[in-house]
C-alpha cells in the first residue's frame, strides 16, 4: 500500500473550526516496539519520561498487554504482534473535521501525481470464528448478564484479509462507510493501522 511519509491522524468527527479536536502528527522523532513482558515496565517509564520532557507520544497497546497485566496467558493469534508500539513527535497540528477532509484529499492528490493507485480496499476476508461459534459465544454472554455476573462484555474476534491500493484511500472509504466519532490512521515506521470506534 502506498504512503510516502510517516504520519498519524487521530480523527474526531465532532471537531470544528472553533474547537478543533483532530490531531495530525508528522515527522516522528522516535519509535519503540515491545515484544517481551520483561521490557514493559522500562518502556512505560521511557514513554512517561518523554512526555514529561514535552515530547508527544502516540501509543498502541495490544490486547495481550492487558492479559499480561492480569497474569493470564497471551492470546496465541497475537503472539507475533508487539505488546506496545509508541511513536514520538515534537509537535502536532489540531484540525477541524473540514480540515481533515481537505488534508485527506490533498494526500490523495499527491498520490495521483505519483501515479499511485488511490483506491484502497480489502480482499480475501477470513473470520477467526464461524457463525455457530459466534452465536454460542453471544448466548453465553447473555446468560452471564442475566445471572448478574457482568453487565457488559466487549466481544471481539479477529478478521483477517489482504489490503490493496492506497492506505489513505482505504481510510477515506472506511471513514465514509463506517461513520463513527473517532478514527485513527497510523502510517509510521512501516506500520499501517486504521481504526474506527464510537468511543475513545
List where the protein language model places each region:
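Extended alpha-helical targeting/anchoring segments
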Residues: 1-200
Amino acid at each position: 500500500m502506498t504512503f510516502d511519509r510517516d504520519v498519524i491522524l487521530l480523527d474526531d468527527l465532532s471537531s470544528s473550526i472553533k474547537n478543533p479536536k483532530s490531531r495530525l502528527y508528522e515527522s516522528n522523532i522516535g519509535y519503540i516496539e515491545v515484544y517481551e513482558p520483561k521490557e514493559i515496565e522500562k518502556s512505560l517509564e521511557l514513554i512517561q519520561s518523554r512526555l514529561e520532557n514535552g515530547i508527544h507520544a502516540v501509543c498502541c497497546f495490544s490486547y495481550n498487554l492487558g492479559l499480561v497485566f492480569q497474569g493470564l496467558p497471551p492470546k496465541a493469534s497475537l503472539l507475533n504482534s508487539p505488546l506496545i508500539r509508541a511513536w514520538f513527535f515534537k509537535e502536532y497540528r489540531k484540525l477541524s473535521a473540514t480540515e481533515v477532509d481537505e488534508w485527506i484529499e490533498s494526500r490523495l492528490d499527491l498520490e495521483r501525481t505519483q501515479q499511485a493507485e488511490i483506491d484502497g480496499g480489502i480482499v480475501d476476508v477470513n473470520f477467526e470464528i464461524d457463525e455457530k461459534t459466534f452465536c454460542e459465544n453471544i448466548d453465553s454472554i447473555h446468560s452471564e448478564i442475566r445471572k448478574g455476573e457482568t453487565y457488559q462484555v466487549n466481544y471481539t474476534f479477529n478478521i483477517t484479509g489482504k489490503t490493496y491500493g492506497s492506505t489513505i484511500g482505504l481510510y477515506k472509504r472506511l471513514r465514509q462507510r463506517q461513520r463513527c466519532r473517532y478514527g485513527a490512521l497510523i502510517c509510521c515506521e512501516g506500520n499501517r493501522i486504521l481504526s474506527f470506534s464510537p468511543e475513545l
